[in-house]
Amino acid sequence: MSERQSLAPAFLFDLDGTLIDSVYQHVVAWREALEQVGVSLAVWKIHRRIGMSGGLFVTALLRELGAALDEEAIVRLPGLHAEAYARHYPGVRPLPGSAELLATLSEREIPWAIATSGAERSAGPARELLGLPPDTPFVTRDLVRYAKPDPDLFLTAAERIHVDIRNAIVVGDSVWDLLAARRAGALGIGLLSGGYGREELLYAGAFRVYEDPADLRNHLDEVGVRRPL
């Protein structure tokens, strides 16, 4: 690798709302799962928590409701959500420019990985959707002790591609991605493709905010990725 390439940052990508257009399928899936255990909740409140670990997600929502669930219902929720998401998954598509962005980074020999709060059961099919090779560094909730907003996912992803987290850029669509990036010691980039507003992402610590992967690809120079000579 050339000196120029070695100076470029590595990239750690969130998945849902960052590379694939799946946030609202997750929102509806969580609503259906919650309804099956007797909890009715407005979808906008669910959306605000997408991207958190499942455990924190449930804890936060129940606190807002002032409700309680028995242990059996709490244990059932992840499976109910996964089943509901699988029903809605046929409507999921790659976000504009996601495959092209990853291909550009690979062509320029810039390391990248994917780190998602989703479990392998729900996140795994995205590999095929994005056309990823089998050896793509792909870290799911199953592989770490704590998911976002804890930094474990991004720290593990950085280890997978043998880069210092301080020389990595986290790309995500939610405030939870950006909080995890800050806690990990990485620079955060926000995307609007998951439904959060520009000001929210900037307030959460984003260095830059772009519309979607295509927009980021068109502005890679702004985050230290130079064009080939």
Predicted regions and their residues:
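Short, acidic loop-to-helix structural element flanking the phosphoryl-transfer center
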Residues: 7, 86-114, 120, 124, ...
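Short acidic-hydrophobic, aromatic-tinged amphipathic segments that line or gate anion-handling sites
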Residues: 208-212
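Helix-loop "lid/cap" segments that line or gate small-molecule binding pockets
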Residues: 33-34, 53-69, 126, 157-158
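Glycine-rich phosphate-binding loop signature in dinucleotide/nucleotide-binding domains
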Residues: 4-6, 107-110, 161-167, 223-227
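Metal-dependent phosphoesterase signature
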Residues: 40, 62-100
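Active-site neighborhood of HAD-like aspartate-dependent phosphohydrolases
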Residues: 2-47
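Substrate-recognition "cap/lid" segment bordering the active-site pocket of phosphatases
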Residues: 91, 113, 119-170, 175-184, ...
